[in-house]
Every structure is written in structure tokens, then in C-alpha cells.
Amino acid sequence: MPRGEREQLIVEAAIAEFSRATYAGASLAAIAAQADVSKTLIISYFGSKEAVYAACVTKIGTQIEQAVADALNSPHHLAGAGAAGERVLAAIFTTFEGHPGDWHVLFDRSVPHGPARDAAREQRTILRQQAFAGVSRSLGSVGLTDPVDLVAATGVWEHMVSALMLFWRNHPEESAAAMVARAHRVLAAMAGHTLDRVRG
């Protein structure tokens, strides 16, 4: 197997292990077992657990960034703030279908200060900037243009997405389509629409 492919297999195994055990609880030995390789091979490829984690969060962050960018650049994004938000959520849910716990690897609070935490922070910063741009465009279309309001709205959006992903992690039997529908109902109800109207 080419080295590049084997590295990707190791990263995928590491994401699963970090999702299951957190950074603090994960070990290179456990990752090696999941990837069906030796711990020595992982060290020769990556050098350290921190470097493995950095590769993981880079992959996760890139996946989210691309999915959200595609949703934001879609013509359907112009259909209104609510529809745009649901489209972004649908893109995120589709990306993580079958492995919703991957999202939380990027937000793992057990990661110590150092290169690993810096790598995760870098990815979160990119996603926060992307979220701010999307929120500003969507909510600007309905009149919310105050810069501080938009910063607050971006924080609300980020925490809402994380809450939905935590729910999904705790209910992994839910499909991406089911999560899209659930988010639609919740957001519509919070906006004051009746469920009969939403279902209709």
C-alpha cells in the first residue's frame, strides 16, 4: 500500500479513537490497533501523538470548510436566512453521517497546550471566520447589520450547531436526513411557526 494511503488509514483510525476516548484518553497503541499497523510505523510517519491529532483536525476542519463553502455558494443560499442556515446544517450532517463524533474531535478540551491545540485552534478560527461571513450575509438580508450583533449571532450559530452535533453523537442511529428534518422542526418552532405548518 502506498504511504499516502496508509497515512490516511491511520488518520481515520485516529479520528475514531480520539472521538471515542478524547485526546487525553487515546494512545498511539490503540490507534495502531485500529489501523492494523504498528505503533512504530505511526511514529515513523507522524513523529508523535500531537502530530497525529494535528493531521486529524486538519482533515476534519477541511471537510467542514468545504461542505459549508459549497452550501454557501449554492444559488439556494439566497432563498432566505432560515433556508440558508438549514442548507448549511444539511451539508454538515451529510459530511458526518455515520460518524457524528468526529465533529467533537475538533473541540476536544483535553488537548494540552502545544502544537496539537494550536492546530485545532487554527481550524476552529477558519470555521469561525467562515461562519461569520455566512451569518453576516444571511442575516444582513433581513436587516441585521450591526457588527457586534453579527458577532453575537455567529456565537449563537456555532453553539447551536455544536448542540445538534452533540445530540447526534448521543443518538448515532439518526440518519443525516432525520437530523436535517429535526433541525428544521426545531428551528421553525423557535421562530414561532406551528408544527402543523412546518410539516405541511
PLM feature spans:
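Alpha-helical DNA-contacting segments of helix-turn-helix folds
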Residues: 54-60, 67, 123, 127
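Pre-recognition alpha-helix immediately N-terminal to the DNA-recognition helix
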Residues: 9-17, 63, 87, 91
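Helix-turn-helix
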Residues: 9, 13, 17-51, 55
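Hydrophobic alpha-helical connector segments
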Residues: 55, 69-101, 141, 145-147, ...
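Regular secondary-structure segments
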Residues: 15, 19, 65, 69-72, ...
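Short helix-capping/turn signature of helix-turn-helix
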Residues: 46, 108-113
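Amphipathic alpha-helical packing segments from all-alpha helical-bundle domains
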Residues: 65, 94, 115-141, 151-155, ...
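Hydrophobic/aromatic-rich alpha-helical bundle segments in the mid-to-C-terminal region
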Residues: 103-104, 108, 117, 139-187, ...
